[in-house]
Amino acid sequence: MGREYPLEKFRNIGIMAHIDAGKTTTTERILFYTGRTHKIGEVHEGQATMDWMAQEQERGITITSAATFCKWKGYAINIIDTPGHVDFTVEVERSLRVLDGAVTVLDAKSGVEPQTETVWRQADNYGVPRLVYVNKMDSTGADFYMCVNTLRDRLHCNAIPIQIPIGSESEFKGIVNLVKNEAIIYEDDLGTVMDEVEIPGDLKDEAEKYRTELIEAISELDEDIMMKYLEGEELTEEEIISAIRKGVISNKIVPVLCGSSYKNKGVQPMIDAVVDFMPSPLDIPPIKGTDPETGEETDRPADDNQPLSALAFKIATDPFVGKLAFTRIYSGIMKSGTYVYNSTKGKKERIARLVKMHSNRREEVDELRAGDLGAIVGLKDTTTGNTLCDEQNAVVLESMEFPEPVIHVAIEPKTKAGQEKMGIALSKLAEEDPTFKTHTDQETGQTIISGMGELHLEIIVDRLQREFKVECNVGKPQVAYKETIRKTVKAEGKFVRQSGGHGQYGHCWIEMSPSEEGYSFENAIVGGTIPKEYISPIDEGIKQASETGTVAGYPAINFKVKLYDGSYHDVDSSEMAFKIAASMAFKNAMSKADPVLLEPMMRVEVTVPEEYMGDVIGDINSRRGRIEGMDPRAGAQVIRSFVPLSEMFGYATVLRSRTQGRGVYSMTFDHYEEVPKSIQEKITGEKK
């Protein structure tokens, strides 16, 4: 089977934006106009084709990146519709890694919003070329020119309008195409009847101004155009398109378009712009990887005749076929029914079937070729970020990095029978989502789930109930405190019991002192005051007793013990008696050694725009945080600090409201530190 579309006619794009800017509606319209759907799905009616999880249809937001394939004027377009909510940033990150271009959707009345900044930064990291579509031009307060200014001011990009609107708010009825220098007026509700007319008289000056701006912007990128422009020659449409394309692919300019997806205006010209200006797989540099044998860097050009290289960028569970591995093919051909080598894990896997996805509908195909996006059925060991390749020409592509979870809660099934079911379900969900983690707390025995925010974990619990039929109780997160000592003391432990027949006798003296890290035990017994066989039980007894300290019953850490004296009884002494004596000695010693409570300190980095810095620093200080330093980063500041974990619960929500959603933070465990006296008293009071 040959290639249906040549590689230069391929476009792999993502649609990204702030929540509620109209991404999913825009994608629905693209599918309608390219003939993929015969009925338009409305998000607010819960019918959108791309929002296929029950939670998405209920909440009207996109949680997972739905992938779909469509055709337009002889071009093949793969589209990924990504979520705009900050808790689902991982989905955006995954998509950008495998896309060649992106359409950023703005709300015409809001311009650049917080999550727009976040996804823009992510796209910058991957060098993804972009164009901007200003949506909702029909809504009250719509302002196209304000949007262009926010792009320039807040994202520091070279935003160049290639269209301007005809009218706005309820009067919005079409666009001026600055490339063709003509107007498009929409005549019907479905947007399929358009009239290409002369630019209205009252817009001629405005159109001339922005067309000149466009020509000047592209002439700076192309010497031939510069010469023609300076000599006053008229540029052809082809020359302008070619120059804009060059500027977009090199990330030097960002074309700005406008429309109203809901009112079916401006969508087809936007699809034209995707075809005209977005790169094909041949326009972007070959994917880089490492040879697993030699460790040398190698690259794989987009070509069917090259050895196979592909990246699994998302794992999803399909109710009918099981595990789906969404994959981008960078080079070579992947065939159904063959084996593929997972070079990340060093394992061979069999491809049962290959499918192209249309949201959650599958179309089976025999092969996927360079540039394709598709899903594989049958891979057992492959996880997000794994490389799939030809075993004889192995390569490991650069994997994806995901942020650590920032919020944790305890969860338990409502019934005993649900325990095993919940374990299986959680491991499946963790396989799908690299930012969702689950573990069992060794101290409380509780199952702890961790994720990117409250909404993220809500959706996880919701999916447990809907997809896996596991009803759960969700608790509040708890902090794992520890205890330690501050001075060296000596203490005795003596266990004597006479109750007819055999008695019990164990007796020891220990010296307990603070230590830098962990626990150590030294046997300093001389002259056999305690026989050798009882030394190990004494060590064991101390270790067991240290699991519940004397301050508030939390585990004791960072101390050392020297066993230096004691006594025994020929008949009554036993291992158990010495174990009990040792635990008594530990309790006596710890209570005299100035014991204190320790709390986990988190290394917290907050990235915020300058104007919110004072507010955020004040908030960190109020949480008993210590500011370690600040670094400037692309129009923002990174505040580095240490903050107690107990003070960080609910921080994501607070930061979001204090910075209008423009602040982001990361949090990792760093070390344990002494709890202030007043807080210690409060915690011990609660424990009692």
From Swiss-Prot:
Region (Disordered): 282-305
Binding sites annotated in the UniProt record for GTP: 17-24, 81-85, 135-138
Annotated GO CC locations: cytoplasm
Gene Ontology BP term (one): ribosome disassembly
Cell compartments where the protein resides: Cytoplasm
Domain annotation tr-type G: ranges: 8-282
InterPro entries assigned to the protein according to its UniProt record, in alphabetical order: EFG_II, EFG_III, EFG_III/V, EFG_IV, EFG_V, EFG_V-like, EFTu-like_2, G_TR_CS
GO molecular function: GTP binding; GTPase activity; translation elongation factor activity
Residues spanning the signal sequence: none
SMART domains, A to Z: EFG_C, EFG_IV
Described function: Catalyzes the GTP-dependent ribosomal translocation step during translation elongation. During this step, the ribosome changes from the pre-translocational (PRE) to the post-translocational (POST) state as the newly formed A-site-bound peptidyl-tRNA and P-site-bound deacylated tRNA move to the P and E sites, respectively. Catalyzes the coordinated movement of the two tRNA molecules, the mRNA and conformational changes in the ribosome.
The protein, known as: Elongation factor G
